[in-house]
Amino acid sequence: MAFLSDTLARVKPSQTIAVTNKARELAAAGRDVIGLGAGEPDFDTPDNIKAAAKRAIDAGRTKYTAVDGIPELKRAICEKFERENGLKYTPAQVTVGTGGKQILYNALVATLNPGDEVIIPAPYWVSYPDMVLLAGGTPVSVAAGMETGFKLTPEQLEAAITPRTKWFIFNSPSNPTGAAYTRAELAALCEVLMRHPQVWIMSDDMYEHLVFDDFDFTTPAQIEPGLYDRTLTCNGVSKAYCMTGWRIGYAAGPVELIRAMGTIQSQSTSNPCSIAQYAALEALSGPQEFLATNREAFQRRRDLVVSMLNEAKGVTCPNPEGAFYVYPDISGCIGKTSAGGAKITDDEAFASALLEETGVAVVFGAAFGLSPNFRISYATADEVLREACARIQAFCAGLS
């Protein structure tokens, strides 16, 4: 009898984590490495949020909490949804988990049966398909390439829906492309979904506050009230509030679903960290001005990276609307040989040779379901990005 489960054989480790770990190992060994794999802001958690956590510790708020979040945080989340998205929820419709990833996973485990399908536009966050597999469902990837701005069309969505479809995962702005759907584009998708009442919508809004050029962020339940009762609107404090290590995600949706997710959490991790919950409460309720300051920095970095990558031979880099990623196409590099003798057969070979020969760590596109591309996280200092892009330019210039 095999010791490891059949389920494990169907999933793979996160490639973004693998690339980040590889870069750290090389740096620890003395290599000059620039890691652009991690989707993590380089800015520190704001002082008022850290102070709230310290107050919670001093006040002895170090015990178990309610499984799916303290009441104060749930109320703050309700206020956030109404203030920023025009969505009204009660605390009973809100759940808090140990990061956005747990929120999504809880929902999938609570709802999927064998044979249930989940539509996932590609390129996608690396964890979506594997979480569906772990939950017993079937991921259905639909390619949304550069020709559509990395956005799913209504026609593609309609064609992908079957009687077995249970969820549609929607992520805007997107990881890995930074693409964000306009109000009109989202409305067109919602029109399709209104024709299929068996399909639920999982909206991953983690990058909501990271949109550029005065882009108007919208979310499905906000655009189409008719979808409110079958939409799980997911968010968290990791990206916008520079709190990736605090591990707090949250979602709002129908009470029956929220209760089911709470049951899953009660038998897995139980409550999120009590101190982190009080920090998240301050994040959502405290001063918000720094969001605009950070957004300006990310927009400046985006402009720098897009400009420099488009000067690299064989590379085409679209200009994303949000998040802190770019997803350049490297069709012009495939089939060539690097200065170090590496055959660039695909985007994984490109990323491997780039790391080995220049010390720049990126994530290859196949990990996100669409090739030939690679992802760069530009959530790091301008001078680091400038050096990394210069190395990429030199690497591409050396291909023959």
Curated annotation (Swiss-Prot):
GO cellular component assignments: cytoplasm
GO MF term (any one): L-aspartate:2-oxoglutarate aminotransferase activity
Chain positions with N6-(pyridoxal phosphate)lysine modification: 239
Compartments where found: Cytoplasm
Binding site for L-aspartate: 39, 125, 175, 375
Family: Belongs to the class-I pyridoxal-phosphate-dependent aminotransferase family.
Site (Important for prephenate aminotransferase activity) residue list: 12
EC number assigned by the record: 2.6.1.1, 2.6.1.79
Positions of transmembrane segments: none
SUPFAM superfamilies reported in the protein's UniProt record: PLP-dependent transferases
Stored CDD domains: AAT_like
Quaternary data: Homodimer.
Keywords: Aminotransferase, Cytoplasm, Pyridoxal phosphate, Transferase
Species in which this protein is naturally found: Cereibacter sphaeroides (strain ATCC 17029 / ATH 2.4.9) (Rhodobacter sphaeroides)
Reactions catalysed, as given in the entry: L-aspartate + 2-oxoglutarate = oxaloacetate + L-glutamate; L-arogenate + 2-oxoglutarate = prephenate + L-glutamate
Biological function: Catalyzes the reversible conversion of aspartate and 2-oxoglutarate to glutamate and oxaloacetate. Can also transaminate prephenate in the presence of glutamate.
Classification via PANTHER family: ASPARTATE AMINOTRANSFERASE
Name under which the protein is recorded: Aspartate/prephenate aminotransferase
GO BP annotation list: amino acid metabolic process; biosynthetic process
InterPro entries tied to this protein: Aminotransferase_I/II_large, AspAT/PAT-like, PyrdxlP-dep_Trfase, PyrdxlP-dep_Trfase_major, PyrdxlP-dep_Trfase_small
Enzyme class: transferase
Listed cofactors: pyridoxal 5'-phosphate
